[in-house]
Amino acid sequence: MLPLNLALTSIALLIALITRPFKAKLETSSPKTILISGGKMTKALQLARSFKQAGHRVILVEAHKYWLTGHRYSWAIDRFYTVPNPDHPDYPQALLSIVQKEKVDVYVPVCSPVASYYDAVVQSILAPHCSVMHVNVETLQRLDDKYTFAAAAESFGLRVPKSYLITDPQQVIDFDFTGTARKFIIKSIPYDSVRRLDLTKLPCETIAETAAFVNALPISKQKPWIMQEYIPGQEYCTHSTVREGHLQLHCCCESSAFQVNYASACQPEIEAWIRTFAKRLNLTGQVSFDFIQADDDSEMYAIECNPRTHSAITMFYNHPHVARAYLEKEALASIVQPLASSRSTYWTYHEIWRLVTDRKSTRLNSSHSTLSRMPSSA
């Protein structure tokens, strides 16, 4: 892939060199210094570009082992630092040192599911020195936990699937499924990259099959699971930036199998749901939600919440007001949403892979069609 990388990078640099002098530089009356983590990720680069285009100074950080990330060389980056992994004891002090040295005004974590916890922990350490666009530990644990998230939403009168906390396989075996209109699925509450895609429907055909299935899962009080209604329908994913309960920036797109393609999909019902949820919890930070519009009743249900940056933020690549959404403490007159002129975003290698596999599939289907038309020998 090196030749392709080199060719694409060279073309992009050439275009940038030609067009850069003609681009209007935005000025701000109050320039800030912004610290962004997760430097190797595309969403971190997108945020860096948005802040830089708005006239702010951008500091990018990443773990030591990713010191050579190409993003450090972006024109949007003023300084680059490496820090220990988020779970390392020295991580909080490393971030604090950068905040103090660079006089950082706002810290915007761009983190993984695991790292989001440590950025919530470090919030209390950084808060006396800068604003932190991340939820606190208590809120993070409440939102990350699929069951407590569903319980909170339901208490606010917001629509979620029927959900049950499971700490012992016997709870599922003894559950009375009679009279339930929908099947159920069971998911690990702690993040499980392997089993998260298992959508086995419960109950199984027999009690014995149900028992065999749930007894094979690592369910315990220490590792609880959630049994939730299975709702077939159109799935949506979102990214929202919230300050003191005000929804400042929001985007929504249809979910896909690999979730590497993003095209804006206007869903006012989802926006209203998130606005209510954010206000009730007085959230500050970045949150992303998964929703599904049910095939059977056409209603919109929130499935889960991930309190961190979503890659759908890339849909704001040409929006001039992203920085305002992150920096303004007061509610904006209108929510920042992808421009009508913005095109869908995608990842080049995935498009190449899809092009190749689609062609293979077409050839196989063509061959199968040809064979099916061939006369059988007598």
Regions found by a protein language model. Give the residues of each.
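ATP-binding N-terminal substructure of ATP-dependent carboxylate-amine bond-forming enzymes
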Residues: 1-134
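Active-site nucleotide/adenylate-binding loops and adjacent lid/helix of ATP-dependent enzymes
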Residues: 140-225, 243-246, 268-272
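Protein kinase-like catalytic core scaffold
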Residues: 184, 248, 299-304, 370
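Phosphate-binding site of ATP-dependent enzymes
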Residues: 204-273, 292-301
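Flexible, glycine/charged-enriched surface loops at secondary-structure junctions
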Residues: 226, 286-288, 335-341
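Conserved metal-phosphate-binding beta-hairpin within the catalytic cores
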Residues: 240, 279-315
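Peripheral (often C-terminal) accessory segments that flank ATP-dependent C-N-forming ligase machineries
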Residues: 324-363, 378
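Positively charged, low-complexity/disordered segments
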Residues: 364-377
